[in-house]
Amino acid sequence: MDEGKRILVIEDDPILRDLLTDWLLAAGYSVDVAAEGGAGIAHARAYRPTLVVTDIHMPGTGGAAVISEVGRIYPGIPVIAISAHFRSNHGLKPEEAIALGAARALAKPFKRKDMVGAVIELVGPPAA
């Protein structure tokens, strides 16, 4: 596993958080997790991930703040925003997440190939 490609997953739903972790580990990446935005931002400050995947709608600090703060602290780190609300008329829209600084916005539910493909596109495949 490539220790140099560490993905931080910030997701309040434990089932989806575990699923994303499993997908990214199976793809060969190292994965860290946080259950809400404030903890995710603190983790990003301490460990400088290669890429951040964040839910937009979470209790406490939401994904919009995560995108802005990660971009402020580490301008080169890509962020993938995820949300079920991207498919509805409620909350942040995908283009708004991109305008905040997200590199990609994926609507839930998404497929494994879409998430892993976006990670590979943004940071490259893990080293063999």
PLM regions: where:
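Non-catalytic signal-transmission and effector/linker regions of two-component phosphorelay proteins
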Residues: 1-8, 113-128
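Conserved acidic carboxylate
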Residues: 11
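The feature encodes the CheY-like receiver
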Residues: 17, 59
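Charged docking surfaces used in two-component/phosphorelay signaling
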Residues: 18-26
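Acidic, metal-coordinating helix/loop segments flanking the phosphotransfer/catalytic sites
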Residues: 33-51, 93
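Acidic catalytic/metal-coordinating carboxylates
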Residues: 36-39, 61-66
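Active-site residues of response regulator receiver
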Residues: 55
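Alpha4 helix (beta4-alpha4-beta5 surface) of REC/receiver domains from two-component response regulators
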Residues: 65, 86-106, 113, 117
